[in-house]
């Protein structure tokens, strides 16, 4: 820590507040350098945190955290917060098994007020916390930091609308790092922001409204004057003013002294306050500034070279999906690809470039994405919604009400199904089979490799009804890709004929199941479809085997194994059943390999669980 003389002194925000203001620029420089060094050695989210260094320092310098409640939306930008709140020396463990959580996490620190991972939750939770503080007359401040992407979600505006109407003391800070809302940043804006956030202006404004409320012509003049003054700062402020907030900004989010002055002024204001700051994602590290998307989440890399390591030669499942999408779009101009702000992650970059008229990024709006797709389907188009398993949870009503009830041909390409690895509890794709399986009209497919994935996507595209294909994060296994052909709905595939024990596999754990089957001389069936289920195959297996093992990378409760159990009960089959899958708890972070081993879903673990079960029967 010799390279970081000031940062090494900061073990809590109390230490930070002992520094004089003139030391803060140096601290910010050290914090940014330390963040870059630590993340490059451990992997993690980089560009967002580089952009919030000054904001983080200013917030902890001005407010009495943890007494004052600081909430971070999503949490990608909270690494500097972790460093300043006693976790500096553990940053090398972030996102690793047993290490620091990748996002703010209540169980990890008293400074983490809200556990997060999904976007747009901070203002709703913050309002609840602020109202509780108001009821208890604690004098506690509530501050919510939200990005310009997250604030576009409907939930954020629902919360803003509510907060403005109840007029509770709280501060919402918009971290605008993509120039997507306003470009009005400069000395004049910073000066006016200090003026408008000051107590003199606030008092004059409120007093003037009361004094002149009975004089319509003068009242209107005061209102117009206020609007014109604010118009110098940012036209977008009108929107937040209409929602009931006192809007300040935009100001330079990398000017630590301007931030502190403005925050101190706003600290004394009552009612809902809104501060708009402009930052640069990847600030201070040229490669990240140039490519903030590429450096958003990074593996281990040499930050001195500034180059990220090249990925495996085997394509990812996301890339397999993206190439399939391009292949079909070239043949069918009515195919429409939809993503809720996950173009890169879902493998849709090439598609968006080759077929811009058939591509829609609807921003962080999962509910809208699904109902938008329903509308396209009604109009005769063939929408494909590319969405992570964990984010499909946010559009469950739309999946039922707007797609399934109307039996509309919408295809859901569900990425990151099963164990996702380092992002932990909030991002595991553990529940989609369970929450989809009970929905009428929906076809659900679980590919075991990339060729099966392509065939199932094509089957879903052609079947003329709601369909879902769920596939995991990471690289495919390298099988040969065959020409596209529709699969018969609800029909499984025999992989290996054995005796006594049958493993019914759902998804990409098939290779592990096959290894186990060799040792046990077990039958292996790739079930392919969770719905409709191949009940005929299950009946045949039950009549010729003494033990059926179901295998899936989904919660056991309500999952594919439960579907098999229900079928066996309905058929009144007398056969033992062992359901293997994800247990009834939230799965923490770790690599996919580590977590599958811990959950005993690798070959060794599956073998062990079967052997233990056999001893009981």
UniProtKB/Swiss-Prot annotation:
GO terms for molecular function: 1-deoxy-D-xylulose-5-phosphate synthase activity; magnesium ion binding; thiamine pyrophosphate binding. It catalyses: D-glyceraldehyde 3-phosphate + pyruvate + H(+) = 1-deoxy-D-xylulose 5-phosphate + CO2. One of its GO terms (cellular component) is cytosol. InterPro entries: Dxylulose-5-P_synthase (IPR005477), THDP-binding (IPR029061), Transketo_C/PFOR_II (IPR009014), Transketolase-like_Pyr-bd (IPR005475), Transketolase_BS (IPR020826), Transketolase_C (IPR033248), Transketolase_CS (IPR049557). Its cofactor is Mg(2+); thiamine diphosphate. Pathway: Metabolic intermediate biosynthesis; 1-deoxy-D-xylulose 5-phosphate biosynthesis; 1-deoxy-D-xylulose 5-phosphate from D-glyceraldehyde 3-phosphate and pyruvate: step 1/1. This is 1-deoxy-D-xylulose-5-phosphate synthase. It comes from Histophilus somni (strain 2336). The lineage of its organism: Bacteria, Pseudomonadati, Pseudomonadota, Gammaproteobacteria, Pasteurellales.
């Amino acid at each position: 820590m010799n390279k970081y003389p000031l940062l090494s002194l900061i073990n809590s925000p109390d230490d930070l507040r002992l520094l004089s203001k003139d030391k803060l620029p140096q601290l910010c420089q050290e914090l940014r350098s330390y963040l870059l060094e630590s993340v490059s050695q451990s992997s993690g989210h980089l560009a967002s945190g580089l952009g919030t260094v000054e904001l983080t320092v200013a917030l902890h310098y001005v407010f009495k955290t943890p007494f004052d409640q600081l909430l971070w939306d999503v949490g990608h930008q909270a690494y500097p917060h972790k460093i300043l709140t006693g976790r500096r020396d553990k940053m090398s463990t972030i996102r690793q098994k047993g290490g620091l959580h990748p996002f703010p996490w209540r169980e990890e620190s008293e400074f983490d007020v809200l556990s997060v991972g999904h976007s747009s939750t901070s203002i709703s939770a913050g309002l609840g916390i602020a109202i509780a503080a108001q009821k208890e007359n604690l004098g506690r401040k509530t501050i919510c930091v939200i990005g310009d992407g997250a604030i576009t979600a409907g939930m954020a505006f629902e919360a803003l609308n509510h907060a403005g109407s109840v007029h509770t003391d709280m501060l919402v800070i918009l971290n605008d790092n993509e120039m997507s809302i306003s470009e009005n940043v400069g000395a004049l804006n910073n000066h006016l922001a200090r003026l408008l956030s000051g107590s003199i202006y606030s008092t004059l404004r409120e007093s003037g409204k009361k004094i002149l409320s009975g004089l319509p012509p003068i009242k209107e003049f005061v209102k117009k004057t206020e609007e014109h003054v604010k118009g110098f700062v940012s036209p977008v402020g009108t929107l937040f003013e209409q929602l009931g907030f006192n809007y300040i900004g935009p100001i330079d989010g990398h000017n630590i002294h301007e931030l502190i002055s403005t925050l101190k002024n706003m600290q004394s204001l009552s009612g809902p306050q809104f501060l708009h700051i402009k930052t640069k994602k990847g600030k201070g590290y040229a490669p990240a500034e140039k490519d903030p998307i590429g450096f958003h989440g990074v593996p281990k890399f040499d930050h001195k070279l500034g180059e990220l390591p090249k990925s495996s030669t085997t394509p990812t499942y996301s890339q397999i999906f993206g190439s399939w999408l391009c292949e079909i779009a070239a043949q069918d101009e009515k195919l429409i690809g939809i993503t809720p702000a996950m173009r890169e992650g879902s493998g849709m970059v090439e598609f968006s470039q080759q077929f811009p008229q058939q591509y829609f990024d609807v921003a962080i709006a999962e509910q809208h994405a699904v109902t938008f797709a329903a509308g396209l389907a009604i109009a005769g188009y063939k929408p494909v919604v590319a969405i992570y398993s964990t984010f499909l949870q946010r559009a469950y009503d739309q999946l039922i009400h707007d797609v399934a009830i109307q039996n509309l041909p919408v295809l859901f390409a569900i990425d990151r199904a099963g164990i996702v690895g380092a992002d932990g509890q909030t991002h595991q794709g553990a529940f989609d089979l369970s929450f989809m399986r009970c929905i009428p009209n929906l076809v659900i497919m679980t590919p075991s490799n990339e060729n099966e994935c392509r065939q199932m996507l094509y089957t879903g595209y052609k079947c003329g009804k709601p369909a879902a294909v769920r596939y995991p994060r990471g690289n495919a296994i390298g099988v040969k890709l065959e020409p596209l052909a529709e699969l018969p709905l609800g029909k499984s595939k025999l992989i290996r004929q054995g005796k006594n024990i049958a493993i019914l596999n759902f998804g990409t754990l098939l290779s592990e199941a096959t290894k186990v089957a060799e040792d046990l001389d077990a039958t292996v069936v790739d079930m392919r479809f969770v719905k409709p289920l191949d009940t005929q195959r299950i009946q045949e297996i039950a009549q010729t085997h003494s033990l059926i093992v179901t295998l899936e990378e989904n919660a056991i409760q309500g999952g594919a194994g439960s579907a098999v159990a229900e079928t066996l009960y309905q058929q009144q089959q007398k056969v033992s059943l062992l359901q293997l899958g994800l247990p009834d708890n939230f799965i923490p972070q770790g690599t996919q390999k580590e977590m599958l081993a811990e959950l005993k879903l690798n070959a060794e673990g599956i073998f062990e669980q079967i052997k233990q079960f056999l001893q009981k029967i």
